[in-house]
Amino acid sequence: MGKPMTASPQGKSFRQSPPPSRVEKAELGPGLYLTATPIGHARDITLRALDVLQGCDLIAAEDTRVTAKLLAIYGFAKPLTPYNDHNGERERPRLLAKLRAGARIALVSDAGTPLVSDPGFKLARAALAEDLPVHAVPGASAMLTGLMLSALPSDRFLFAGFLPPKGGERRTALEALKAVPATLIFYETGPRLAATLADMVAVLGGARASVVARELTKLHEEVRRASLAELAAHYADAEPPKGEITLLVGGPAGKTADLEQLDRLLDQALPFMPVRAAADLLADALSLPRKLVYGHALARKDRQDD
């Protein structure tokens, strides 16, 4: 299709000038740039992330070898320094000193969004505590990619990161999450996956809809959807899977449906009843905690008043 034509005052036609670019490369100012990188497919990087990685003075990386390979794919190199759980206490003061001096530092994890199950949050928190500039450069996330592919409810979800490696502590953590009326999202390692699924069946029950997603956006991506019991049985007899794993578990049976029903009934009741009265009535009718119902009622009332 050709470019649109516009009539000139003399009746002749001419081609419109292209509109000014709305994605012009901005000059990189000082500060800490929390920069997301791909979780697998190298093209899943943003233009802004490339601008930051090319324009910064230093990249603080969870593993400098991994980040160096990533930069080589895009055809450039930058000074790298390791920043991880092992050296964070030692490196943080040095990086903060550079930020105070006006340096432009990009913080990256090995894959995905930094600060999500990642050691970088202490550096970001320390920089913010000193009123140093901190910028988010959003992008890929295994947690959200897994949720997108899971077919589980996405209106309410809770990211719980890695569960404890020891069985007793892991089961205690799962007990605390048992009644959460939302999709639960975890990261897990291949060697621990079978034991984690077995503990989930024991604590959460085997009927919950669940998903094991691994190697997301990579060549050997696998998304396995089944009940917790079926997944536990499969991985109990299988070799430990390789690659990064995102584990998703549906909320407790009935709870999500109860909350959806609660919101519908609140929308009907609040135009005619005070918030407290509507909350008390529906908490009794649906056998839900009064505090939870009152919180929903306040939120629905605010939405109606907007």
Predicted regions mapped to residue ranges:
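Conserved helicase motor
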Residues: 82-90, 163-166
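General beta-strand structural signal in soluble alpha/beta enzymes
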Residues: 61, 134-139, 186, 212
